[in-house]
Amino acid sequence: MLRLDKVIKPWKESAALNDHINLYGFWTETTFLTKSGDVGMVLNVPGVDYESLDRSEQEYAVKRLEAALKSFGPGFHVYQYLFKSNRPDIPFAKYDDPIVEAAIDQRRKFFEAKRDHLYQVEIFYCILLEGARSKTGVAAALARFFRDPAGAVGEFKAQFTNDSMKTLLRSHIEHDVRRLDQCVQAFVRQLADFMQIEVLDRQGQFTFFRRLLNFDDWRVAGKPQSTQFLDYQVVNSNIEAERDHLRVGDHIIRVLTMKEAVTETRPLALDALLKIPANFRVVTEWTPLAADKARKEVNKRRRHFNMSKTGFVSQMGNDATNTNPRDVLVDESKQADIENLGDCLRALGDGQSLGDFSLTIVLYGRSKAELDQLGTEFAGIFTNADGSLFSETYNQLNAYFAIVPGNYALNLRKLFLLNTNYADLSFLFTILPGEKTNTFLGTEYLAVLETDNSTPYFLNLHNGEVAHTLILGMTGSGKSYLANFLLQNAQKYAPLTFIFDIGGSFQSLTRIFGGSYLNAGQESRDFTINPFSLPQTKENLQFLFSFFRVLIEGNGQRYRLDFKEERRLWDAIERMYMLEPTQRTVSNFTNIVGELKERLHRWTRGGQYGFLFDNAEDTLSFSRFQTFNFHGWNDAPEVLEPLLFYVLHRASNEIADPAKLATFKIFLLDEAWLFIKNETIRNYVVQAQKTWRKHKAAMILATQSIKELEESGMLAIVAESCPTKIFLANPEMNREVYREAFHLNDTELDLIGGLVPPGQMLIRKAQTSKKVHLNVDSVSHWMATNNARDNMKKRDYFERFGIADGLRHLAEDYPFQPRTLATSTSNTNH
């Protein structure tokens, strides 16, 4: 006989999907409430980039986290979530400049085409506090039995189920919320100097919960419609259970749980998880036990193993008084377990804590075959760490629902773990993506690069208010190419750009952006200089005094002015401004400077270098993109020094112009070691690095010779003044000099030594370093390249189509093929 009640019973017990979610609603802007009376907060944890840390730094970071996690004692559930997903958000703003927009648009298309193979890593913590009312409800239910039998029965039932609503008092909830908030704030403060942890608001938590139960972007998007019924609102996908996988919306889900813990934990024990190119969620749950309960659990297991190590038959068949203990067969494995448990007791006595720990991995994609392959890869990681994973089948729904905060009653895969081991397995280390916004300029990032793990890295030169940058690399490592790339991306800020070039590396880029390229070499001069054309200000008079002192004393200061000569020089400079402007020339100046006339003879029209400064007019002017080519003066330092000094002063006046205070400025010294050989120029550069921050200016020094910086005494100064350092390939570097000058550890030195040109670099900012790859699109390449063959093509296309359209046509006709990053697997889940 067919009994309908038996047929529909499983359907009734399965209930609606939201019935399996223990979330109830939002209590405050940052606190959520569960149906069982628990309160919780969700934290966005930026993490620490592990790539450049040595072993001691890794251990220090873990110890800091271990100490901070002690804020959460018995009654807390600490959930940690590691999200890795493809198609990261890479924002690109729109720009009015057609050339800038052409470059940005091509960069946008370049990354859009490869978004399926790019990933992002996110870390979240959820701190859940079990409600105080739920822990004392049995006694309360018995106490109210005679005055309210129905309510008492309902309350009594609610204590033994996790998905039934409980009647809670506001005072109890408020008390729990205050305690939770205090503990979370203590946790955040302990790590405040380490990383900036964000407590998610209502919208952030809603999106987080939806991401746990939905895998399509359109299903995750949305806002909470009410502060209640959160279980109903976050579920936005159907779930179908198959024998060995789930179907959630349009995705196939595989759930793996940790069956055996890693035998010996250490920092970055599971770092291989970060390197797998796949979409997944890794979730851990940690529930600290009270000290007395922890000891009780350990002793219970010690007694069990002690009783079972000799076997029941051996114990019954031997007389304990007459039998030698050495004659009894002992299970050595059980004895080892007893000793390990004894070590655990000693650890508890030393202040460590024991807790329930579980780890769940959720793989998602659209191909079951790919997920099967990934499952094997994940299992291999744990096997190599002496642990093991179990692929869930009949328990997969429980395991999947258990990743939602508050669903701890469904978590059936728990292991005991010490807090020190838990800290090692915590999600602390990550792959930092840089900063998407430049907080100082209030704009988007400077440029997008890529990491070894196929994640985007958003580069900003600024560290706070300072953007001075040092670029170091051997010949052929790509310094000029990188500098061109950085300058072309910086044009999105509409800056004043000044470049001191040697050899014409930036001539093409200057033309592309409509700048002025002036040759200041011996063979060609595009401007004339008259130092006395400067307005009569205190700063300019002081500069002229230093300038003529350089002319008189010569390179290496072969002649030194005495006190009387210094006074005579100053008086002569002041008297020059009594003459008519047309009479203010170097030749006339020598007539009133007295005995110093002979020292200045070679700088007059009748002398060797009179063409440089002895001119009636000064035609030197600055455009928004200004490049000076000093090619040809490398072998004449006595001329290069005053020429640089004058042009540098004029550029500095442009930078310090109060009318341009709101404009960002970039000053690039290519082959900087040639420019700072002279003490006067060095002092000027040092002073500029100290003061240009106030004028919203950044100085970029590109050089291949660290030896020249060291011998000139500039190495320590530049290392301190340039908070951003970009190291390109240099396998023959002096490791000890690099270590001492830039405070690099062995890991960072190894990374620099292993860089492959062109394109690979190590970017060091503040106390962190990141190895990245410069993979350019075709337009960026054609803007940055500067060899003769490419320059001829650019000249032809620019004449035919204009600059903006010419770049687009070059990219279409001669596409550039960027370097392809190697990944551990060829399959990618969408």
Task: Give residue ranges: language-model regions.
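Short beta-strand-centered segment that lines the nucleotide-binding/catalytic pocket of NTP-utilizing
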Residues: 495-507, 522
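A short helix-turn-beta junction within AAA+ P-loop NTPase domains corresponding to the substrate/partner-engaging
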Residues: 515-518, 714-727
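Walker A (P-loop) phosphate-binding loop of P-loop NTPases
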Residues: 476
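P-loop NTPase motor domains
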Residues: 48, 55-71, 293-300, 387-388, ...
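Extended, folded cores of ATP/NTP-driven motor/assembly subunits in large transport
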Residues: 1-433
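Hydrophobic anchor at the beta1->P-loop junction of P-loop NTPases
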Residues: 471
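Hydrophobic positions on the alpha1 helix immediately C-terminal to the Walker A/P-loop
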Residues: 482
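Conserved lysine of the Walker
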Residues: 479
